[in-house]
Amino acid sequence: FDVIKYQQKRLGTKKGFIAVKPNCSIQSYTPALAAWKEFGPKELVVTTYQAISGAGKTFKDWPEMEGNIIPYIGGEEEKSEQEPLRLFGKVVDGKIEKATAPLITTQCIRVPVLDGHTAAVFVNFEKKPTKEEIIDRWENFKGLPQELNLPSAPKQFIRCLLYTSDAADE
């Protein structure tokens, strides 16, 4: 909320503000990274698998997409590499100063799914956490909505579901 007071001053208003949401493909994994902040994520390799709804399409108006993938989505990789750094940055004199880490490398792929994006994320840390620490930080992570006890906020923001190869076969 730090940027809002600067925005209101610039716009000459005491109420209201302009809010933007992050790129849809990064929303699935940036909260998980925030939960691991103490371990110092230093490098990410991310592959996103983005549904056709992200392009504003349906299978009815994009039938050639059925059964196909597009291995490059123009502009998405740049956004996916830069926008998390803005989210992890800080407000200095009313402007967002991007974080300098982690170094993010992305590949964004359009897949023949109507709705929903998926991300495969590989992380290298400054301080390597144990599996138990990773799960604990996810299970106990509280975002700002939880801290403010907002009525629409889920009690547990991140849920960790563990699957073994045996469970996947069932």
Regions found by a protein language model. Give the residues of each.
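N-terminal Rossmann-like NAD(P) cofactor-binding subdomain of oxidoreductases
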Residues: 1-65, 69-71, 103, 150, ...
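Predominant activation on well-ordered alpha-helical scaffold segments within soluble catalytic domains
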Residues: 30-37, 81-85, 89, 135
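Oxyanion-binding "anion nests"
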Residues: 77-120
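Short hydrophobic/aromatic beta-strand micro-patches
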Residues: 122-124
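Helix N-cap motif at beta-to-alpha junctions
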Residues: 126-128
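Short amphipathic alpha-helices in soluble, non-transmembrane regions
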Residues: 133-141
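Active-site-adjacent substrate-binding region
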Residues: 141-162
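Conserved small/polar residues in nucleotide/adenosyl-binding loops
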Residues: 163-170
